[in-house]
Amino acid sequence: MFRHKVRALVVLLVVVTLTGALGVYAQGGKVTFMSTQFNTVEESDKARAILADFGDVDFVPSEEGPMIDLLKAEAQAGSGTVDLVGALHGTFPVLAQEDVLFDLSDLLAEIQAEYELPEAFVELGKLGTEDYQYYIPWMQATYIMAAHKDALQYLPEGADINALTWEQLAAWAKNIYDATGEAKLGLPVAGLFHRFLEGYLYPSFTGGMVTGFKTAEAVAMWEWFKSDLWPYVHPQSIAYEFMQEPLLAGEVLVAFDHTARLINAFNERPEDFVAFPAPAGPAGRGFMPVVVGLGIPFTAPNPDGAEALLKYMLSPETQARVLKDLAFFPVVGGVDTSGLSAGVAIEAGAVSAQANSPDALPALLPVGLGSRGGEINEIYRNAFSRIVLNGEDIQTVLEQEGANLQKLLDETGAPCWPPDAPSEGACQLQ
């Protein structure tokens, strides 16, 4: 079933022999599921309701730190209490480094025989290895594009809204401007705009988030953004936090934002708006998913139950319930959205299309910066403000802000994270 399972059983047998603690094996069918997600009272109650249809599950919400400490301690002891682990992608490199997780490649193959999973997310679960599946993707949240249907008539000839390029988005925005006399593309500069820069623009043009920060490709990207896109961005964008209100008010016709900050537009007027994936650049279709995965520790007392529960969590029916009740989007194909609100169903289609794009390039939230995570956001925002709003020299700005970025990486020791290639030690800019 699981690769390396023999190793775990040998350890457990040694423990049993030495201590007589036969209780390390699970009795009955109970599965203990520890998760860093759904750890508020309201969310955990909803999660338990979903899990109740599987059977006897002990759902244990946890913060990341205590979960890691527990799994490390149980690995060292050779016996455990946790069967299934649910956590953000960024938790799994730590668990992999401690060597506490089964390789789930065989289980993944079984699941993929039944359901379609985004290949980009499957690769993330390998954590840079060739064939060791540390986790199987469970659910996602992300940022997408939205447009009023009145804007569709201005799409460039031959453009596919589900496979746009950044150049086509700029041409679309220009066409709208030429026809209406107004800049109608909206960006949440006062909101989560740093994620737009980190997870969408930079990966699409440079192939990474960090290493290519000051490269020739980055310079070309900023030149394009400043001259070809920004002139057609609504001037009030610098004050926009959420894009759903400007869309509903008709101030903008096309917008980028987090799904949670667009949902009101789709729910209130589903007949007026469409959702679609972010555009692609020369290096791919950069996008920033919040990927949550499921893993099974070597010390799981009930690994068979963990496998069955993992399969249950990835069934289209369960994925639909998680979306409806807990607002995380599915990672499997075939999810029935007919019972969901119109807005959620509209967004789900775009989220799925984005993750399953052949050129999908997932850019993960910064990893390894600890309490200084906010500093990287300021560096990208400063680059934007200085280049686009203040008109400073692009290369000069990138050299200066790049030095700040490298200092942050060096001082925290943060290794590179996807889509940048793994690094030994602190991530280094090119």
Model-derived features: where do they sit?
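Long, aromatic- and glycine/proline-rich binding clefts that accommodate carbohydrate-like moieties
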Residues: 324-386, 414-430
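Glycine-centered hinge/linker elements that transmit conformational signals in sensory
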Residues: 170-177, 210-239, 266
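Extracytoplasmic/periplasmic solute-binding protein
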Residues: 125-143, 162, 167-211, 217, ...
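Extracytoplasmic/periplasmic substrate-recognition and gating elements
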Residues: 151-153, 227, 233, 267-333
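Paired acidic/hydrophobic, glycine-rich loop segments that form the ligand-binding mouth/hinge
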Residues: 83-86, 253-258, 274
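Hinge/lid segment of periplasmic solute-binding proteins
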Residues: 88-144, 274-279, 343, 426-430
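Conserved N-terminal structural module of periplasmic/extracytoplasmic solute-binding proteins
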Residues: 3-4, 8-9, 22-93, 321, ...
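A ligand-binding cleft/hinge motif common to bilobed small-molecule-binding domains
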Residues: 91-96, 257-272
